[in-house]
Regions:
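ABC transporter nucleotide-binding domains
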Residues: 1-76
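Short, charged low-complexity intrinsically disordered segments located at boundaries
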Residues: 19, 78, 138-140
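ABC transporter nucleotide-binding domain
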Residues: 42-130
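C-terminal coupling/interaction segments
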Residues: 115-159
Length: 159
């Protein structure tokens, strides 16, 4: 087994599990350590397998969820915070995600204290922040934006 890479070990384990054609399959981080093409192959394999069976996916890789799941559950410290469809989860965070761009470092720090930040970038225009919270920022230059699955996860787990 020392001859196999982490990705190869993952593939071998998945094939072993699929050989028995279980009615219920649990996969934990099945695409971690795989190159992008292999990730897609594994996702497609699991989607095909799930057509007639139940596959429980445990992962932190948002792309895996978006490509494979029609039902989601979000857990924190052993408690379910959300169960339902991806669309319903995205709707929970709708109206609670904004993007602000500022050249003012102190304003950026203040926004970071007041909101959950899902993204921070230094651009030619200034500091671009993606904020999540209950109320729209009063600072100028903040606009509502489309919700990503990552935004929805952060919103639900930090309420």
């Amino acid at each position: 087994s020392d001859l196999l890479s982490g990705g190869m070990k993952r593939r071998v384990g998945l094939v072993q599990a699929l050989l028995h054609e279980p009615d219920f399959l649990i996969v934990d981080e099945p695409t971690t350590g795989l190159d992008p093409e292999e990730r897609i192959r594994i996702r497609n394999l699991l989607v095909d397998f799930a057509e007639e069976r139940t596959v429980l996916f445990s992962t932190h890789v948002v792309e895996d969820l978006m490509a494979t799941c029609n039902q989601l559950a979000v857990m924190k410290k052993g408690r379910f915070l959300y169960t339902g469809t991806m669309r319903e989860l995205l709707n929970k965070a709708r109206g609670h995600v904004w993007e602000c761009c500022t050249e003012d470092e102190s304003l950026a720090r203040e926004l970071e204290r007041k909101y959950h930040i899902s993204s921070k970038q230094y651009t030619e225009e200034g500091i671009r922040l993606r904020l999540l919270g209950e109320n729209m920022p009063s600072e100028s230059g903040c606009i509502a934006c489309d919700v990503t699955l990552e935004d929805a996860y952060i919103y639900v787990t930090n309420r």
